[in-house]
């Protein structure tokens, strides 16, 4: 499933971290076509050195009795199709079923700040990041 909105990138993953939705903005920002990522685990986006930490947090969030739908906004390192790691502003939106049980996660990304500029957001995994490119 895709759409034609490219002002933001949106990705929806299920409880197992499998990509279920990928919009045109995600294809534009990250360089991966929807046909290549829908149905796959989201590992391709996660910087390899951060994968273990990412999956620990993701699985813990999805295993909760009730999901917290309010999540902080931050710059997240993303592995683009070109192999370049870029930092994109990211908001997680936890998806709950009708009984407030975890059902998945929506990730909404904005365009990265221009080189040498800051958007004022903190960086996820700051101890391992390189400056934005």
Protein language model features and the residues they cover:
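Beta-strand residues that line the small-molecule/cofactor-binding core
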Residues: 80, 85-87, 104
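Terminal output helix/cap of sensory domains in signal transduction proteins
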Residues: 48-82
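Sensory-domain boundary/capping and coupling elements
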Residues: 115-133
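Conserved hydrophobic beta-strand signature of PAS-family and PAS-like sensory domains
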Residues: 18-20
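Short hydrophobic secondary-structure edge segments in sensory/regulatory modules of signaling proteins
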Residues: 8-12
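Short loop/turn elements at sensory-signaling interfaces that couple input to output
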Residues: 89-105, 111-119
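PAS-family sensory/regulatory domains
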Residues: 36-52
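PAS/PAS-like sensory domain cap-loop motif
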Residues: 26-37
């Amino acid at each position: 499933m895709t759409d034609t909105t490219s002002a933001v990138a949106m990705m929806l993953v299920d409880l197992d971290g499998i990509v279920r939705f990928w919009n045109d903005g995600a294809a534009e920002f990250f360089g991966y076509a929807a046909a290549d990522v829908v149905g796959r685990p989201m590992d391709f986006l996660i910087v390899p050195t951060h994968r273990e930490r990412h999956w620990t947090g993701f699985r813990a969030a999805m295993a909760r009795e009730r999901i917290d739908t309010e999540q902080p906004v931050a710059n997240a390192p993303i592995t683009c199709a070109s192999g370049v790691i870029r930092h994109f502003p990211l908001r997680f939106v936890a998806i709950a079923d009708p009984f407030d049980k975890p059902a998945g996660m929506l990730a909404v990304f904005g365009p990265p700040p221009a080189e040498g500029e800051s958007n004022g957001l903190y960086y996820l995994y700051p101890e391992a990041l390189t400056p934005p490119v």
